[in-house]
C-alpha cells in the first residue's frame, strides 16, 4: 500500500476538503504540508511536514518549492500529492462498455470507492511502465477506455519515488509557478518515466468553482502566467504550445 499521502495547504485551516474525503483506513498515512507561520493553527490528528520559514506566501515560487520538498521527502516511497480542495468521483462504467452501475454519468466516491481507487493506483505503481498515475479531471470528456497512458495529469498524483530517485536532482522543480507540475511531468515523461490516468476515477477542484478562496492563485496576472508558460514552451515545444498572440 502507498506509504504517504501529502496534502500541501495554506490558509485553509477550516476548509480541508481533501482531508475530509480520505477514508479512515488511510488517515494514518496523511501528512499535511504547512508553512511554518501557521502550523499552530492546525489541530487535525495527522502527521505534519513543516516547510522552512523562507517558503511562504511572500515567495513567488512558494508552491514550486513546497512540492520540491515533498518530492525529496518521497525519494524512496510510494506516495501521492493531493491538492487540498478535491472531491473524488467515480464515472458510470457504462462509458467503458460495461453494465451501468449508477443512475447518472458520475457520482461522488463513497469511502469504499476511494479505498478501491487508492488500491488500484498502488498496484499500477508496481508496473514497470508506470512511475506516476492518478485520476482524470471530471470536467474533461472521458475516453471510452478505463485508462490512458502518458497523458495529462494534475492536482491529484501518485508517484513511485524510487523509480526516478536517481534523476530527481536533475529535474526542473523550481523554475516556474504557473504550470510547475506540467514542467515536472513532461520532464519525467521525456526521460521515459511513464504515467497512467484513470478514466473511471476522477476528481473535481472546489477552488475552480469559486467555492474556496486561494491565496496562491487569486492574485495571478497575465504577465506572470505568460512568462512561466513561455519557459515551458521553450523546453518542450513539441508538447507544449501557447496558442495565443501576446499582442
Residue ranges of model-derived segments:
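A structural signal for short, well-ordered beta-strand segments and their strand-loop junctions
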Residues: 78-83, 131-136, 195-199, 241
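A short acidic (Asp/Glu
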Residues: 16-19, 42-43, 90-93, 143-148, ...
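Conserved catalytic core of nucleotide-sugar-dependent glycosyltransferases
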Residues: 89-182, 190
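Structural alpha-beta junctions
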Residues: 24-32, 44-49, 123-131, 191-194, ...
Amino acid at each position: 500500500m502507498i506509504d504517504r499521502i501529502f496534502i500541501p495547504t495554506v490558509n485553509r485551516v477550516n476548509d480541508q476538503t481533501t482531508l475530509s474525503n480520505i477514508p479512515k483506513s488511510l488517515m494514518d498515512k496523511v501528512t499535511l504540508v504547512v508553512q511554518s507561520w501557521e502550523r499552530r493553527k492546525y489541530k487535525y490528528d495527522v502527521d505534519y511536514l513543516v516547510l522552512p520559514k523562507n517558503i511562504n506566501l511572500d515567495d513567488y515560487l512558494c508552491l514550486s518549492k513546497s512540492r520540491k520538498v515533498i518530492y525529496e521527502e518521497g525519494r524512496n516511497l510510494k506516495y501521492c500529492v493531493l491538492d487540498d480542495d478535491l472531491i473524488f468521483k467515480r464515472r458510470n462504467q457504462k462509458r467503458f462498455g460495461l453494465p451501468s452501475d449508477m443512475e447518472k454519468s458520475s457520482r461522488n466516491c463513497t469511502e469504499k470507492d476511494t479505498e478501491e481507487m487508492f488500491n488500484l493506483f498502488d498496484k499500477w505503481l508496481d508496473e514497470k511502465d508506470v512511475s506516476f498515475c492518478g485520476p482524470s479531471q471530471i470536467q474533461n470528456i472521458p475516453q471510452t477506455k478505463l485508462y490512458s497512458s502518458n497523458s495529462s495529469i494534475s492536482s491529484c498524483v501518485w508517484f513511485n519515488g524510487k523509480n526516478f530517485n536517481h534523476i530527481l536532482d536533475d529535474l526542473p522543480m523550481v523554475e516556474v509557478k504557473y504550470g510547475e507540475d506540467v514542467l515536472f511531468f513532461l520532464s519525467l515523461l521525456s526521460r521515459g518515466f511513464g504515467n497512467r490516468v484513470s478514466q473511471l476515477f476522477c476528481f473535481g477542484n472546489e477552488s475552480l468553482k469559486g467555492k474556496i478562496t486561494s491565496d496562491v492563485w487569486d492574485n495571478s496576472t497575465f504577465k506572470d502566467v505568460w512568462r512561466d508558460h513561455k519557459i515551458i514552451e521553450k523546453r518542450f515545444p513539441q508538447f507544449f504550445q501557447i496558442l495565443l498572440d501576446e499582442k
